[in-house]
Each structure stands twice: as structure tokens, then as C-alpha cells.
Amino acid sequence: MFTGIIEEKGTISKIMKNASQAVLTIKAQKIMEDIHKGDSIAVNGICLTVTAFSKNEFQADVMHETLNRTALKMLKPGSSVNLERAMASGGRFGGHMVSGHI
């Protein structure tokens, strides 16, 4: 679940597409302080799973159906995106409950 409150703005650094999916590489700062493989990150409100990460970037796979049904298809390198980590249990609840699953 997400609160709908944007934690930071990230930047698309690379998009790799193949027959079954696209892989987004996203530059970020604040959320990178506590990120793990498998974490859920809302990217422009759409829940994506972290598949890899480095010091200042993370990657997420996006299935073609998700691309076809969302504005993620409009992204290109250099695009700015809204980022939010999933709400932690017992964490502060300052927005409203949002599920970003397609």
C-alpha cells in the first residue's frame, strides 16, 4: 500500500525494451537510502518491483500490458517521475490508502 504522498522526484536514465517487457533504470537519492531488491516503489503512482539497484539508481521491469494501459509508455530518458516507497507497517499514515497495482 502507498499513501499517495510523493517522497521525491526521480529521473529516467535508461529504458531497455525487449519482446516481453521494458526495464526502467531510474535515478533517485532519498529512496536509495533504504532500498532492497524486491521492494515496491510507486513510479508515477504505478507499483513496480525493484529488480536491481546501485548507489543512486534502481531498475524495475514493466510488462508490455502495463505499458499499454498506463502513461509509463510516454517515458523517455530524462523524464521526471514521482517516487514513493511502499508504506511500512507501523509507519506514519499521512495520506490516503492507494494501491498502485495494474
What are the roles of these predicted feature ranges?
Residues 1-102:
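Conserved loop->alpha-helix
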